[in-house]
């Protein structure tokens, strides 16, 4: 079998950098250890909100949405403390721009607006939930320097909770309190249908989900074991953006016919917001920085180096893609043969590979970043996508991925179709 090689490397001159050597990422919970007044690892609550969660005040769902207040007209005012570093300003500005370019939420810098967020260097990574009125603080310390963490805290300030606190989380996670300190047990409480509502499916790749070992070894265990290393990802998922849009009732007067589960962009109604791995006005094209591969009825091999030409660690991901196509209605199969130069970690937040094989093109598929997890190597992945995107992410140096791929005659159309239960988009299951 002939292995075709390729290289996707970026010379690092525009990316935000966090240091010259690999630095252990500290999640929101770890950064806030010892900080008073924190619930759920990184959330600050007003006294009224605490009474709601503690059950000392009873409210209807309509009243609850008033407790977790939205920003009027989806416009958020903010300012930076003088000590807020230039790197953090760039990172936070990038996070706000990402949200505003894919939703109807807009951000405006102002230190005199009646309601505003104050960004401060100190106190770990934490935020209040929703708009509290007046000035509220968003803490963004030195352990927060990753793009998805910036978005994570902003999403709290927009009124969104953690994925692992959803009232239906027990369908997707097993929660162990064995190694959780007694004073931390409250961080693992679920919300109720009376305090929150779910607008999207449970998303293992959400930037609002903590990792497997956040509160202690094996505290949050995925009931789908394929997702164990995906939990804690800080890339920002498509469904994270959908969550914001639903929260703020974003939309356009006229909807486009977006493909592959995309939606009309409330920030620019002439184009669609596309799931990761898809691009173009209507989400029917490959993203830039994509290598296109054509599957045959026999196994073909391919390897690719992707990432940076330097070992500096960045605060955001360099994304590159493979796009595997086959004749219409054929089923594509992929095998990951080797992962070289990957950093094994929960959340795969240094580098990772995602084969988008599931029927719902919007959901995050399991990420792979651990060469020692040999049970996932040389295993046939049967895709319900044609073309099948493979997403490669990198924050530190470069990595090498080797795959085999082919198509088989099993018609995709022989699969049943369903929805995610939250909207009407149909896909193969």
Curated annotation (Swiss-Prot):
One of its GO terms (biological process) is molting cycle, collagen and cuticulin-based cuticle. Keywords: Disulfide bond, EGF-like domain, Glycoprotein, Hydrolase, Metal-binding, Metalloprotease, Protease, Secreted, Signal, Zinc, Zymogen. Its main location: secreted. One of its GO terms (cellular component) is extracellular region. It is found in: Secreted. Metalloprotease. This is Zinc metalloproteinase nas-17. It comes from Caenorhabditis elegans. The gene is nas-17.
């Amino acid at each position: 079998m002939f292995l075709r090689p390729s290289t996707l490397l970026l010379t690092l001159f525009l990316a935000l950098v966090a240091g010259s050597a690999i630095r252990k990422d500290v999640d929101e919970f770890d950064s806030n250890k010892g900080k008073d007044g924190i619930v759920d690892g990184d959330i600050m609550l007003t006294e009224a909100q605490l009474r709601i969660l503690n059950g000392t005040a009873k409210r209807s769902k309509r009243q609850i949405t008033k407790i977790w207040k939205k920003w009027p007209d989806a416009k958020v005012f903010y300012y930076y403390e003088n000590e807020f570093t230039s790197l953090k300003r760039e990172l936070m500005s990038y996070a706000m721009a990402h949200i505003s370019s894919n939703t109807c939420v807009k951000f405006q810098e102002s230190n005199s607006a009646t309601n505003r967020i104050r960004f401060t260097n100190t106190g770990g990574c934490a935020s209040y939930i929703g708009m509290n009125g007046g000035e509220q603080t968003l803490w963004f310390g030195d352990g927060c320097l990753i793009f998805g963490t910036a978005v994570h805290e902003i999403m709290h300030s927009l009124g969104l909770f953690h994925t692992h606190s959803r009232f239906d989380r027990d369908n997707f996670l097993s929660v162990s309190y064995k190694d959780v300190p007694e004073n931390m047990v409250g961080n693992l409480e679920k919300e109720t249908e009376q305090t929150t509502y779910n607008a999207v499916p449970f998303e293992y790749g959400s930037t609002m989900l903590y990792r497997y070992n956040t509160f202690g070894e094996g505290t949050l265990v995925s009931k789908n074991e394929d997702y164990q290393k995906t939990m804690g990802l800080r890339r920002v998922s498509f469904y994270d953006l959908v969550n914001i849009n639903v929260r703020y009732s974003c939309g356009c007067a006229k909807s486009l016919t977006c493909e592959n589960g995309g939606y009309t962009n409330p920030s620019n109604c002439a184009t669609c917001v596309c799931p990761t791995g898809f691009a173009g006005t209507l989400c029917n094209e490959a993203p830039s920085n994509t290598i296109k591969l054509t599957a045959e009825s026999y196994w073909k091999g391919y390897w690719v180096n992707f990432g940076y030409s330097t070992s500096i660690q960045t605060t955001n991901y360099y994304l590159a893609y493979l796009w595997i196509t086959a004749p219409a209605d054929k089923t594509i199969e992929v095998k990951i043969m080797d992962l070289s130069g990957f950093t094994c970690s929960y959340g795969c937040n240094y580098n990772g590979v995602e084969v988008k094989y599931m029927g719902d093109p919007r959901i995050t598929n399991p990420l792979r970043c651990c060469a020692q997890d040999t049970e996932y190597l040389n295993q046939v992945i049967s895709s319900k996508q044609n073309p099948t995107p493979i997403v490669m992410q990198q924050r530190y140096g470069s990595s090498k991925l080797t795959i085999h791929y082919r198509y088989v005659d099993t018609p995709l159309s022989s699969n049943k179709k369903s929805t995610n239960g939250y909207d009407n988009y149909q896909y193969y299951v």
